[in-house]
Amino acid sequence: MSVRIEHDTFGEIEVPADKYWGAQTERSKRNFPVGKERMPIEVVYGFAQLKRAAALANFDLGKLSEAKKDAIVYACDQILSGELDEHFPLVVWQTGSGTQSNMNVNEVVSYVANMYLKDHQIDESIHPNDDVNKSQSSNDTFPTAMHVALYQEVETKLEPALKLLRNTLKEKEDKFDSIIKIGRTHLQDATPIKLGQEISGWRYMLDRCEIMLSESKKHILNLAIGGTAVGTGINAHPEFGDKVAHYISENTGYPFVSSENKFHALTAHDEVVQLHGTLKALAGDLMKIANDVRWLASGPRAGLAEISIPENEPGSSIMPGKVNPTQCEMLTMVAVQVMGNDTVVGFASSQGNFELNVYKPVIMHNTLQSIYLLADGMETFNNNCAVGIEPIEENIDNYLNQSLMLVTALNPHIGYEKAAQIAKKAHKEGLTLKESAIQTGYVTEEQFEAWIKPEDMVDPH
């Protein structure tokens, strides 16, 4: 392997000649061969947005020449294009401030920017610390890149997937509004409900999650940049943070602002905890929806079988013809993982000692993973399951007509105790509810027909 020699304050080190990173990235690669979880590329793109904006801000403030500004902006745009992904090899499990990833970006930007200057025959050079990282510290850049990445992924990936599934459930809710089925509480028969009403509960869960997500993501718009090492802003111009936030907003289209309290921004990540709490709430709702779907689709002959779901693949390697609710199982596993991630994010956020929280990479990793899993999970569940849900009306009608809980409609006419006697007699003697009611003498056949109407029970008002 061909190498070149790079150096840092620790001395010289060999770096692969075809890679754009420098000495500090190479040391991190060697010092932290831990796990396979690479720093998400979205974080790198968040850094690129930041470094680009910082160059523009430093130029405005007279801290950087126009040539250096142009070179850094060019390098950052190259990163944002996705052309340089291979030059960001570091894992999540590194220093808790994310310093190595910050330097990885600084070194790659410096390398590409210097090529730009050379190509344009400009007699200047870019230093990763003195120029790319000017007016910055890893302590304020990593949380800034984290917020930029999280906000963008919620906007571009999670919210569209949430809307997609919500809209499908709304279509099913409207389509099945005339189908009356038995309701169930405590896993036992209850009073009737429309299939559309049942699905409306699922849909409304997603409506509420969409609102909660919209509210919680607003706090992610606050950026730590300008706080530098401990929140005081040492080595940065007083206007630097606001200018960087402005340029990030200009390039992304999102209204980022510089946090009004940088001490908080460096040592606490409660804004991410709140965001992930919403992800956990969404995971809980998806768990409930997926469980309901697979129970209602259980069978085909010895289960509830009130709905059918698409048959996407063989379900068993030993039982021919078996088809399993695999999309539901996928979504419930996603939900469990997100709930686990929430525990990590909450605990990691609590570990801000004095002026800095040093669990930033794991907070970032787990939150992004939750966003990816929920977004991909909802889209896949929607396309391969939800869109194909159909009622099995014969079974639905059979369960409804056999239910003893229709007796609830008699309460206002004969009282709770007599209605309970009718239900118990029917269950004990294997009678229909109508047969039991007439045999007790509490109601006539005409009264039973007038009072026991499932269509009235689902819309009592």
Curated annotation (Swiss-Prot):
* GO molecular function annotation: fumarate hydratase activity
Q: Where does substrate bind?
A: 97-99, 127-130, 137-139, 185, 317, 322-324
Entries under InterPro entries matching the protein = Fum_hydII (IPR005677), Fumarase/histidase_N (IPR024083), Fumarase_C_C (IPR018951), Fumarate_lyase_CS (IPR020557), Fumarate_lyase_fam (IPR000362), Fumarate_lyase_N (IPR022761), L-Aspartase-like (IPR008948)
Which Gene Ontology CC terms are recorded?
A: cytoplasm
Question: Major place of localization?
Answer: cytoplasm
Catalytic activity, as annotated = (S)-malate = fumarate + H2O
* The gene coding this protein: fumC
Superkingdom in the source lineage: Bacteria
Keywords attached to this Swiss-Prot or TrEMBL record, sorted alphabetically, are:
Cytoplasm, Lyase, Tricarboxylic acid cycle
Q: Which family does it belong to?
A: Belongs to the class-II fumarase/aspartase family. Fumarase subfamily.
Organism expressing this protein natively:
Staphylococcus aureus (strain MSSA476)
Q: Name one GO biological process term.
A: fumarate metabolic process
> Pathway it belongs to?
Carbohydrate metabolism; tricarboxylic acid cycle; (S)-malate from fumarate: step 1/1
Class of this enzyme:
lyase
Mind telling me what this protein is named?
Answer: Fumarate hydratase class II
Q: Which residues form the active site?
A: H186 (proton donor/acceptor), S316
Query: Upper lineage ranks?
Result: Bacteria, Bacillati, Bacillota, Bacilli, Bacillales
Task: List site positions: Important for catalytic activity.
Answer: E329
- Where does it localize? Cytoplasm
Known EC number(s)? 4.2.1.2
Report the protein's function: Involved in the TCA cycle. Catalyzes the stereospecific interconversion of fumarate to L-malate.
Q: What else is known?
A: There are 2 substrate-binding sites: the catalytic A site, and the non-catalytic B site that may play a role in the transfer of substrate or product between the active site and the solvent. Alternatively, the B site may bind allosteric effectors.
